[in-house]
Curated annotation (Swiss-Prot):
Residues 292-534 form the Glutamine amidotransferase type-1 domain. Belongs to the CTP synthase family. Homotetramer. Pathway: Pyrimidine metabolism; CTP biosynthesis via de novo pathway; CTP from UDP: step 2/2. ATP binds at S14, I15, G16, K17, G18, I19, D71. L-glutamine binds at G354, L382, G383, M384, Q385, E405, R462. This is CTP synthase. Residues 1-267 are annotated as: Amidoligase domain. CDD domains: CTPS_N, GATase1_CTP_Synthase. It catalyses: UTP + L-glutamine + ATP + H2O = CTP + L-glutamate + ADP + phosphate + 2 H(+); L-glutamine + H2O = L-glutamate + NH4(+); UTP + NH4(+) + ATP = CTP + ADP + phosphate + 2 H(+). It comes from Cyanothece sp. (strain PCC 7425 / ATCC 29141). The keyword Lipoprotein does not apply. Catalyzes the ATP-dependent amination of UTP to CTP with either L-glutamine or ammonia as the source of nitrogen. Regulates intracellular CTP levels through interactions with the four ribonucleotide triphosphates. GO terms for biological process: 'de novo' CTP biosynthetic process; pyrimidine nucleobase biosynthetic process.
């Protein structure tokens, strides 16, 4: 029988429920338990695919093409397990499903209500994850904060869930904040008491409290929490702020979280193997030579919009053995200013994905700067499309070249709409999404990094390289090193005369793991480290460095 752990949050939003859920997943997996993690988001959007990055942050894409919350990225990276569209549920998708059933007549003329129809649909989605993958434990994170009106149907559903599947199969974990008040010189438990009181008024009694704090809980705090929240002292878990999110599983292991979860769910206590994770964190904190990577993007005001890119760079830096310093650059700032003022001194440039014309000329300026100054470069999705435009204008002498997305009337649309997108009118969920194969050119940098002929990567785009210009580009030194198996879609481009210049139509960042860095990011960071070393020694790189994978 699958066990279920529900993770709620109290006091403040963005308290770290996703990291706690992902960390618990890692701890259970280290004990050889199979785990799946589900995110219940209370917003009414069907999915985050059409939401502004400034409001939502990154849209994480799964293998099966679901556009999901960024927390699913944490789940995958911590557990090294691929999630699917079943692992992401929103209020909008629940209501959409219920209304579709009502229109079909599935409810036989009954009055459709929050209870039981909405709550039943929520419970069905949870059970579907258990049925699909048959894990030992399903961890369910409920988005938002206890007390939010949007979360009430989810909380009611998980209250009912315990009765329906058996009390011995369900555990409630509440992540809360214990703030330090400097003027009083003490930690305050009252916000947590009120949060737990709110949960109990709904009918949910937490079994475990995970207490976020910026310092150790001093003696007596756990006893007080236990007394006022009706939770055993050993189930009051300290989760102190860490330098890196990857240390959190180790902190929670020391606090005995996994052992307590297994005890409450009547599961066998097994010895964890966290040696690889411990080594990862030790490498992360070890002093190393620095590399400074510029991320030139449109949404840098909210860096969570590029969360998987940041994490993939961190994974690579750990593997390569260097200290990662990120320089965030708003691409709009480069449109009317000298790129040298913003990019001078960096050892690598990343131009990530995005949509729309705003800031595109700044991205193109950054690409030109990296190309001309022999700085290691990595372009992702829109970053690749901007590389194509820059090459067309600067090298192929098509000065008016553009993407049909930015200028539908351009006489040289080097980037064009995918044929299957021509008649699409609805924006949500209609892009080229999910995992697709890509065939690599054998004598290319891409092949040198991947060491495979056919790779699989995740996509999220509507536009592609226009093959009408392919021969012109190839004649000017442009290399298409990766394409769809039928040769129609350009997936990877590179410049062999550059120390490291590669760009992809797909999003490699979604498949990077802390213990298995993505080969493109590892190669890029290694090239950035070489560039930094050469610059320190007064050398100018003139050829592609030898890259180990």
């Amino acid at each position: 029988m699958t066990k279920f752990v529900f993770v709620t949050g109290g006091v403040v939003s963005s308290i770290g429920k996703g990291i706690v859920a992902a960390s618990l997943g890692r701890l259970l997996k280290s004990r050889n338990y199979s785990v799946s993690i589900l995110k219940l988001d209370p917003y009414i959007n069907v999915d985050p695919g059409t939401m502004s990055p400034f409001q939502h942050g990154e849209v994480f894409v799964t293998d099966d093409g679901a556009e999901t919350d960024l927390d699913l990225g944490h789940y995958e990276r911590f557990t090294d397990t691929a999630m699917s569209r079943l692992n992401s549920v929103t209020t909008g998708s629940i209501y959409q499903a219920v209304l579709n059933k009502e229109r079909r007549g599935d409810y036989m003329g009954g009055t459709v209500q929050v209870i039981p129809h909405i709550t039943n649909e929520i419970k069905d989605r949870i059970l579907r994850v258990a049925k699909d993958t048959n894990p030992d434990v399903v961890i369910i994170e409920i988005g938002g904060t206890v007390g939010d009106i949007e979360s009430l149907p989810f909380l009611e559903a998980i209250r009912q869930f315990r009765t329906e599947v058996g009390r011995q199969n369900v555990l409630y974990m509440h992540v809360t904040l214990i703030p330090w008040i400097p003027s009083a010189g003490e930690m305050k438990t009252k916000p947590t008491q009120h949060s737990v009181k709110e949960l109990r008024s709904i009918g949910i009694q937490p079994d475990i409290l995970v207490c976020r704090c910026d310092r150790p809980l001093y003696p007596g705090i756990k006893d007080k929490m236990s007394q006022f929240c009706d939770v055993p002292v050993k189930s009051v878990i300290t989760c102190q702020d860490a330098r890196s999110i990857y240390e959190v599983p180790l902190i929670l292991e020391r606090e005995g979280l996994a052992a307590q979860v297994l005890s409450l769910l009547n599961l066998e206590q097994r010895t964890p193997d966290l040696s690889e994770w411990q080594s990862l964190v030790e490498q992360l904190y070890r002093p190393k030579p620095p590399v400074e990577i510029a991320i030139v993007g449109k949404y840098v005001r909210l860096t969570d919009a590029y969360l998987s890119v940041m994490e993939a760079l961190r994974h690579a830096a750990i593997a390569v053995g260097c200290e990662l310093n990120l320089r965030w650059i708003n691409s709009e700032d480069l449109e009317n200013n000298n790129p040298e003022a913003y990019l001078g001194g960096v050892t690598g440039v990343v131009v990530p994905g995005g949509f729309g014309i705003r800031g595109v000329d700044g991205k193109i300026a950054a690409i030109r700067y990296a190309r001309e100054h022999q700085i290691p470069f990595l372009g992702l999705c829109l970053g690749m499309q901007c590389c194509v435009i820059e090459w067309a204008r600067s090298i192929a002498k098509l000065t008016d070249a553009n993407s049909a997305e930015f200028d539908p009337q351009t006489s040289n649309p080097v980037i064009n709409l995918l044929p299957e997108q021509q008649d699409v009118e609805v924006l949500g969920g209609t892009m080229r999404l999910g995992l697709y194969p890509c065939r690599l050119l054998s004598n290319s940098l891409a092949y040198q990094l991947y060491q495979e002929t056919v790779i699989y990567e995740r996509h999220r785009h509507r536009y592609e390289f226009n093959n009408a210009y392919r021969n012109l580009f190839l004649d000017t030194g442009f290399v298409v090193s990766g394409s769809s198996p039928d040769g129609r879609l350009v997936e990877i481009i590179e410049l062999p005369e550059h120390p490291f210049f590669i760009a992809t139509q797909f999003h490699p960042e979604f498949r990077s793991r802390p213990n298995v860095p993505h080969p493109l990011f590892k190669g890029f960071v290694q090239a950035a480290r070489t560039h930094s070393s050469d610059r320190s020694n007064g050398h100018t790189p003139s050829e592609t460095p030898s890259l180990s994978v």
